[in-house]
Amino acid sequence: MDSTRLPVIFLMGPTASGKTDLAMRLREHLPVELISVDSTLVYRGMDIGTAKPSPEELAAAPHRLIDIRDPAEPYSVADFLVDAEREISAIHRQGNIPLLVGGTMLYFRALLDGLAQMPAADTSVRAQIEADAAQFGWPYVHQQLAEVDPDVAADIHPNHSQRVSRALEVYRVSGKTMTQLRREQQASGDVRAFEDRYCVRQIAISPRDRAILHQRIEQRFHAMLAQGLVEEVRRLYQRGDLHTDLPAIRAVGYRQVWDYLDDKLHYDEMVARGIIATRQLAKRQFTWLRGWMTNEGARSTSENSQLHWLYTETEQGKPLAKEEIVRCALNFLKPTAI
């Protein structure tokens, strides 16, 4: 380990890949404390549909940045950066290693690249974007964004109108994408790279075969329904102060159940769309991870900036025991803890 930089571990992966289970098992072997990197786990009262660790699991392996917002409250990338930097520093002061675990790739990327200063809002540009959306739909506007800034577009659902609009607005106002602005400000020294301050070990856990993940996603969504997902969303629905323009309610699974409660979907259609939306989320997460090493290689040749893939099956497709997955992770991470 580089003695001039304190260690930090990233544990990333698509939804339903086993990230949380691995993180809690690693805690039994390494002096780590867990920080959640998930844009939905921040919300209180949203437990089943987010696959939030149970109270018993959280008591055994506490996660920071879980249950820190009401669903009516916004939570931005900038909020996450402030919270994550604070928790990382606190864990280091205690002599432990921060292990950041989750699937919100935009948060991980923002940590590595820093949060660049973006141009101020332009009402005329935003009005034109909204006019295009009204005429052609938000998926059309999202495609326009993907053509100029595929990295940012990959993490934004086409129906997430506010984020799509803002990202495209930044490009039209400045002539540069959000991705370009972040990289330029980092190169100029305006944003000090995360890896300049920390010794980072990055792991991505995933099945080798996408079909295996799709099967897990379907099984997990049915399990969530059996555990009371509809009732959980109903409690949110009946509050009266929540609506589908809020990021919390647009979360995968929640939006589909909300539409079911709003009589916009039949039950079977809600189930099918919930599974499809979750698979689409996993696809976006894979898109980020596939480009991760390319992006890292362009920025740094440091061993500590490289992504280590950890597959949950052998090359022959045989599932690895959980103990074997932990052993593989420890083989990569042990130098971090020395």
UniProtKB/Swiss-Prot annotation:
GO molecular function: ATP binding; tRNA dimethylallyltransferase activity
Pfam families linked to this entry: IPPT
Cystines in this chain: none
Cofactor(s) annotated in UniProt: Mg(2+)
Presence of keyword Secreted: no
EC number, UniProt record: 2.5.1.75
Region (Interaction with substrate tRNA): 38-41, 162-166
Keyword annotations of the record: ATP-binding, Magnesium, Nucleotide-binding, Transferase, tRNA processing
Function: Catalyzes the transfer of a dimethylallyl group onto the adenine at position 37 in tRNAs that read codons beginning with uridine, leading to the formation of N6-(dimethylallyl)adenosine (i(6)A).
Similarity comment text for this entry: Belongs to the IPP transferase family.
Protein name, UniProt field: tRNA dimethylallyltransferase
Gene: miaA
